[in-house]
């Protein structure tokens, strides 16, 4: 089993591996790099992987859901009618209505001819069966900067507010912001950078403990809402988590230790 504890010794919980879950994949399927995991209201586990990252995985659907018994319940993904599919998947989220959100971004794609910053500049919304519902961003266009209200820049993560159906996107590999859209219509709502300020795409100083905290995000890599009504953003390049009200008002921040040592969280 596995037991996790924080640096103060408080135990987070005990976990044991179930070697029989999930069941073996169908014949001919092979997973590439898994870049996202989510759960839905039925306790199905969803994953998204990169078929183009592993030789022999090209025919495996990028999105796969397993039921509680580990059997494949859904599988789909790739280009389709009415939407565009990027070259580098990055992240998956299942909202309060069990709609599935898929992101694209994250470094250079496996295909060296693809344009990493423009091909992977969108977020897609589907039903659990893979029916296309909504596209935010565009393919082959890319960002117009962190103040663009239309285009994304290699988004990294998605969270949907069940109360408003607004979708919060950490737009972080090329841009430096959190951007919010109407999750039903795709209309732009608002965006912000570090400390709730307007984002700045200028040079980012290298993070150091000896300097003042950076005023801007540096690769915001996750966004999530909590039961306290606040929004938490992982600012990976600056080794911190920033906390906001839903309108982007800054609340607090916490820095991650530079060296966590052995097995600490």
Predicted regions and their residues:
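Eukaryotic scaffold repeat domains enriched in small/polar residues
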Residues: 2-265
